[in-house]
UniProtKB/Swiss-Prot annotation:
Belongs to the globin family. Residues 1-38, 96-123, 143-185, 367-389 are annotated as: Disordered. GO terms for molecular function: heme binding; iron ion binding; oxygen binding; oxygen carrier activity. The lineage of its organism: Eukaryota, Metazoa, Ecdysozoa, Nematoda, Chromadorea. This is Globin-like protein 6. Residues 196-347 form the Globin domain. Residues 376-389 have a biased composition (Basic and acidic residues). The keyword Iron applies. May play a role as physiological sensor for oxygen via redox signaling and/or electron transport. It comes from the Eukaryota. Heme b binds at H254, H286. Keywords: Heme, Iron, Metal-binding, Oxygen transport, Transport.
């Protein structure tokens, strides 16, 4: 009897020891594992478990009523008591390895070989994690059960200037735009923003221009206009419109204005503060109150033919030793720049004139409507006078 009581006592002791170990393992799961363990991927955990000599002693916590399938046996889940379920230190941590099967659900076991099945298992595991673990303890950095992390697309992310976080999917689209005076007409861009001439080009351009001016004060400009007459007869018709004296006076006036513009431009080629205001204003003057004021309307494409005539004349300026490729490139840049600025001024003035005409039409229509309403009211008042009763 003494031996039997001893055996029973030892047996009882073993049972109680196993129960305490079982209870301690559950406490280890909830107390020993730190908060950052939920952010550790399953691959890293498996690598650390494979490096250690002993197998993992902690059994994962599963959902109530769910069993996990181990090779050769079924182990019931470890359910936390109400004390741990209601505690603030509850942390969900999965200690599954690659040798263990996924969490068993109500649906039949799926084959994990295909990517579609793996995604379905991952979705069920993530749903189970949200059901068991409080939302405040779920790590922000989530990984799928395969352990792979999807790096954010840094190429398609743009940091907001007013906010501290980044907005994914917003691509920064920066476009290099040339300065425009449509938004603010009083601000004109500088010349150096458009013309990028080298010092040798500036030197040869000034030298050839002075040589052409020595032949006559207005000779370079007059030769350019006469050459443009052969490019397009409309240019000749507009400048020489009217009597012979009127045409020559108009040609002389154009040559004087063009010479002044070219003198200012060539003198300020290397000036950082020189603007294109003079060229824009010259282009604006080609918008006339009457469309056919000088025989035919002025079009912007006529300036292209004027540029061709000017380039042909620049090749003849200067001494023969100065007519180099450097000089020709410098003059070509200047001619194209001048015609482009004249076009800009002409087109801006056209838009402004159209807006003014539209406003005049609307104001005229509203005034006529007011006049008609006033006449109707006066007729009604006269109808109720004593004379008509």
């Amino acid at each position: 009897m003494g031996n039997q009581s001893t055996k029973s006592t030892h047996g009882t002791t073993r049972v109680s020891h196993s129960k305490s170990a079982h209870h301690n393992s559950s406490r280890v799961t909830s107390d020993v594992i730190p908060r950052s363990a939920s952010a550790i991927s399953s691959h890293e955990r498996f690598f650390s478990d494979s490096q250690s000599s002993s197998p993992p002693a902690v059994c994962p916590v599963s959902a109530p009523g769910k069993y996990r399938n181990f090779p050769g046996k079924d182990v019931p889940p470890i359910c936390l008591t109400d004390e741990y379920n209601n505690s603030d230190d509850e942390v969900f941590c999965s200690t599954r390895t690659s040798k263990q099967s996924p969490l068993a659900t109500g649906c039949p076991r799926q084959n994990l070989g295909s990517p579609g099945n793996r995604r379905s298992v991952d979705s069920t595991n993530s749903d189970l994690l949200e059901a068991v673990t409080p939302r405040s303890h779920i790590s922000v950095k989530r990984t799928v059960s395969s352990g792979t992390e999807h790096a954010p697309d840094h190429a398609n992310m743009q940091k907001s200037s007013s906010l501290k976080f980044t907005r994914p999917g917003v691509r920064s689209e920066t476009k290099e735009t040339t300065p425009s005076t449509s938004s603010n007409p009083t601000m004109f861009p500088c010349i150096h923003q458009f013309l990028h001439l080298t010092q040798p080009q500036i030197l040869f351009v000034r030298k050839t221009w002075n040589h052409a001016r020595n032949q006559g004060a207005l000779e370079p400009a007059i030769s350019i206009f006469r050459n443009s007459f052969f490019k397009n007869p409309e240019i000749r018709q507009m400048i020489m419109f009217g009597t012979k004296n009127e045409g020559h006076e108009r040609l002389k006036k154009h040559a004087q204005l063009f010479t002044v513009l070219m003198d200012d431009l060539i003198a300020n080629l290397d000036s950082p503060s020189a603007t294109v205001a003079g060229l824009r204003e010259a282009g604006e003057k080609h918008v006339w109150p009457t469309r056919n004021q000088y025989g035919c309307p002025f079009h912007a494409h006529l300036l292209d033919q004027f540029a061709t005539a000017m380039i042909e004349r620049t090749l003849e300026w200067g001494e023969k030793k100065d007519r180099t490729e450097t000089t020709q490139r410098g003059w070509t840049k200047i001619v194209l720049f001048v015609t482009e600025q004249l076009k800009e001024g002409f087109q801006d003035e056209q838009k402004r004139a159209r807006r003014i005409k539209a406003q005049i039409k609307t104001s005229a229509g509203s005034s006529s409507f007011e006049i008609s309403t006033k006449t109707k009211q006066s007729d009604m008042k006269r109808f109720h006078t004593l004379d008509n009763m």
